[in-house]
């Protein structure tokens, strides 16, 4: 397996671990000290988080057959990070700040790493055009 494809695979497994663990925990814990509406949205998003983790695991296992799915997963994670940035700009950084920044940094970096590595893998594995006679 090419190194760049292995990088994508490791990123997918990392997303899978975070999504499966985080989604499961949030599904059971819910949103503490809140309204029914916010808890409902929180647990719904925990299901999306868990589902994305499972899809990422499958994509990592079947990485040699994946292309567009890698970009779509990267986009989803990037959009989640952007959502977190918007929240921080609108209502402030939750405490402890280091924890929330620890979530944000991978949400912004992993998608870029995944997309760049997938793009270079795709280019290297693309068949060469036929030679002119």
Give the role of each language-model region.
Residues 71-85:
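Hydrophobic alpha-helical membrane segments
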Residues 60, 82-102, 119:
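Membrane-helix boundary connector in multi-pass membrane proteins
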Residues 1-16:
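Cytosolic juxtamembrane helix and N-cap/initiation of the first transmembrane helix
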Residues 1-5, 61-67:
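Membrane-interface helix-boundary motifs at transmembrane edges
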Residues 108-133:
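Membrane-water interface at the C-terminal end of transmembrane alpha helices
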Residues 17-25, 39-60, 75-79:
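Core segments of alpha-helical transmembrane spans in multipass integral membrane proteins
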Residues 35-42, 94-106:
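Non-cytosolic membrane-interface motifs at loop->transmembrane helix junctions
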Residues 24-32, 53-62, 83-90:
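Membrane-helix exit/interface motif
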């Amino acid at each position: 397996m090419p190194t760049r494809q292995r990088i994508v695979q490791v990123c997918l497994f990392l997303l899978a671990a975070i999504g499966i663990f985080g989604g499961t925990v949030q599904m059971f814990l819910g949103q503490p000290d809140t309204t029914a509406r916010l808890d409902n949205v929180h647990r719904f998003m925990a299901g999306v988080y868990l589902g994305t983790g499972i899809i990422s695991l499958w994509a990592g296992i079947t990485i040699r057959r994946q292309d567009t799915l890698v970009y779509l997963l990267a986009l989803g994670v990037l959009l989640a990070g952007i959502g977190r940035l918007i929240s921080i700009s609108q209502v402030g950084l939750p405490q402890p700040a280091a924890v929330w920044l620890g979530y944000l940094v991978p949400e912004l970096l992993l998608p870029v790493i995944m997309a760049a590595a997938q793009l270079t893998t795709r280019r290297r594995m693309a068949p060469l055009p036929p030679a002119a006679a």
